């Protein structure tokens, strides 16, 4: 059958993406075909579009169908698939999602509860699973924990603030403007630092009685990473989970020595590779989403053909909620 897909034939800016009609084979054994209903737009997509193949973003042959996650309805099943049936609502973390239809291994699907809408799942599945392992497994936050989150008003920042507060942690967020500060305050943050007008190192130390944060979640990268080392507590952890401002360059490992700082550069792929862990992570996420325990604001909705504009908006850093594409 034919499917429409947003592809790149060369790496570059948003303008390199184009809507193509391509052939999609019938689902192979163990696979299903999904009619995508809502597609998440994430920074991983920008890294792929630009050709940044560091870390988990391995190089692919061109042309590339864009995208790393979506939700939809199973349209066809391949041989030996017994876990899912036609008509079931599912989400997935996987390639080629900027398309009207996608084939995926049945073993990598997440069944969506009725209480979680397609838009919420599309906006929060990847971000939510990332937040789950960052807050509940990589570093277990809870009462007595002080966490600092960079880009607190962004899509990841909002769910980290909400879920961190739910777990009992004290949440400090950094933002670039007073408008974003207001957004972050409404989503679980106990203190907000506007780094455009104040020194976030000094302010973090002030907020923590000079001790530093227990854990710092950095999705910014180049602009924030080294400064984060100066405001984490001794034996604390700096988690570099994203590089929105550019990759972190080489740095002297001795900078970690005086405070025994732990630095990690994790990827979601490693934390949901085990099926049992993936199932437990999705259950935890869907419990907080469907139970109304956290707010789930949504940003702009773009038609699939306007994927380039969605990328421009995400890269503008003006976004304070997840962006999705609607096929």
Positions of PLM-derived features:
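Glycine-rich phosphate-binding loop and adjacent beta-alpha segment
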Residues: 175, 223-293, 326-327
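Mid-domain Rossmann-like dinucleotide-binding core that forms the NAD(H)/NADP(H) cofactor-binding site
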Residues: 124-197
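NAD(P)H dinucleotide-binding glycine-rich loop of Rossmann-like/cofactor-binding domains
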Residues: 63, 68-69, 76, 89-153
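Glycine-rich beta-strand-centered segment in the early N-terminal region that forms part
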Residues: 23-41, 53-96
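Short amphipathic alpha-helix with an adjacent loop that forms part of the alpha/beta core around
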Residues: 200-210
